[in-house]
């Protein structure tokens, strides 16, 4: 059973909607909703909340903000948890409600720290028709407010293309704003996590631009200390996800598939902490033959390791 509430009273269609998925985010939800409601824009926007049968204070907090901001929220309160039943929240409940030109995202445990975030992103997309999406840099924090990393990279603002996504680049969902066509062209046949499909679809339809501005916080939650073994297992799981994702895409040549799978593996080994994890174990976990991939990229790996040895002395 689904209970829907709406505080939308305006007749005009907002220019932007914000997809906000909530499940037991009560400890962090006020940060999220404060960031969403504090946006300074010269256009109307709406917030589409989906609460997946939270058992904590989340529903109460959402209703509190609905009363404070009666023109912003359209909310679905689930009686039974949908995610645990294998139901896709975005494609089943959120995407069918979208009526706006642009779509932004922010889960209930993430939050925005720039009151001009939506305005900056919409201004950019309005003046760059060749771009399908835009995003800013992010800060990564733990369950409290302690920074894990201030920014994911120090690179300057730049354009990303499909080649980048297929090679292992994902865009921070808490910071991205996409054109409606990204949602309209969503491929429901691809069985993968939403972050990958979002990045792939956006990059397939146009350039994706990264602004230098740091406008969002991604909260990395989890209990206990993450050991190096835990981290390796997590990265292996992510590699499996990429492998399965690549297999579902229609590449014109088999070598093209190998090319992108190789790039993702090398990216993880060199840049994401798997260089201390035995390569044979990586292959075993992936359950596929990557001998050619290993031979093809071994020189690059050696150069990378040698460089790391000398630069860390």
Cite the ranges covered by each PLM segment:
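Short aromatic/hydrophobic "clamp" motif used to bind/position activated sugar donors
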Residues: 103
